[in-house]
Amino acid sequence: MSASQNIVVSETTMSSIIPNNNNNNNNSSSQKLPPCLISISKKKLLKNIDIINGGGQRINAWVDSMRASSPTHLKSLPSSISTQQQLNSWIMQHPSALEKFEQIMEASRGKQIVMFLDYDGTLSPIVDDPDKAFMSSKMRRTVKKLAKCFPTAIVTGRCIDKVYNFVKLAELYYAGSHGMDIKGPAKGFSRHKRVKQSLLYQPANDYLPMIDEVYRQLLEKTKSTPGAKVENHKFCASVHFRCVDEKKWSELVLQVRSVLKKFPTLQLTQGRKVFEIRPMIEWDKGKALEFLLESLGFGNTNNVFPVYIGDDRTDEDAFKMLRDRGEGFGILVSKFPKDTDASYSLQDPSEVMDFLRRLVEWKQMQPRM
């Protein structure tokens, strides 16, 4: 992705090393946990101070990025290139996963398919109020059938409790807070031999009090901005600006930055009409995907075929991990061309459901081993 498409701002004012919380009793002694250390260099420190204290030009750059975070039309093109040509070119590079279904299944032959699904914009439509992003009963039934056929995980920026209240399927893996809160299926619900029932991993456990305090301060600071909505996702916080008047965006940027100045070990990232505040550790949806594959026994093997479906910038870490791994692929959910590491595309949650249904039908037609 280009820099304008994948902005990560680290709000840092001190050099530090943050260790992984390996003393957490929730970690299984037999589970090989990936390292989770981050060192902040002096060069990065100075750069982050500049970001925090930047003037109007820096704020304008953020506002421009906010406009681009949820495109509603094709990006502007040179006059010599038509929008249809641009769309056709993008589709050639990221063809429909429905149209290429047989080709995808051929690539998976002889391998264990493992499914990873984002929630908002993938299993449910994007809505103005994140508390009303309900999954349809048809989608729930489809995902339930999918989990009978393949190990299946929900990987989301939401906290696990909130997304579980939407999905309500105990047989799934859940990776909430952008993968910083991972739980396995409820005891007795998994149909897959490799699943570890006691799986629980929280690499940012030490940050819980800090996130609670940031949430409280953001709630207070942004209450003067109509339409702003602050959420606590347990291991990260978010500020939604989908319902904020564009004239108020600069004000909102200042409010968020004024809070983060006090918390040097947190970073600010941007998704679709939302700011995400999370711990500055080497952990994202891509790392969560790696951890889950390791937990399933597929850490160092080539007989697995992971499929990740998502619509947001934060899903790009998972897409890139799969591309670098050279196994499986990512599917971007979008009606508009975007820079992405995904291999295929689907337009909206209805197409996602169609793709998942075809996967279930394909699996049911395979001879039992």
From Swiss-Prot:
Pathway field: Glycan biosynthesis; trehalose biosynthesis
Domain of life: Eukaryota
Record key words, sorted: Hydrolase, Stress response
Keyword Signal: no
Catalytic reaction(s) noted: alpha,alpha-trehalose 6-phosphate + H2O = alpha,alpha-trehalose + phosphate
Gene Ontology biological process: trehalose biosynthetic process
Cofactor: a divalent metal cation
Gene Ontology MF, one: trehalose-phosphatase activity
CDD domains attached to this UniProt entry: HAD_TPP
EC code(s) of this entry: 3.1.3.12
InterPro entries in UniProt: HAD-like_sf, HAD-SF_hydro_IIB, HAD_sf, OTSB-like, Trehalose_PPase
NCBIfam families: HAD-SF-IIB (TIGR01484), T6PP (TIGR00685)
Family, as annotated: Belongs to the trehalose phosphatase family.
Primary role: Removes the phosphate from trehalose 6-phosphate to produce free trehalose. Trehalose accumulation in plant may improve abiotic stress tolerance.
Protein name: Probable trehalose-phosphate phosphatase I
Provenance organism: Arabidopsis thaliana (Mouse-ear cress)
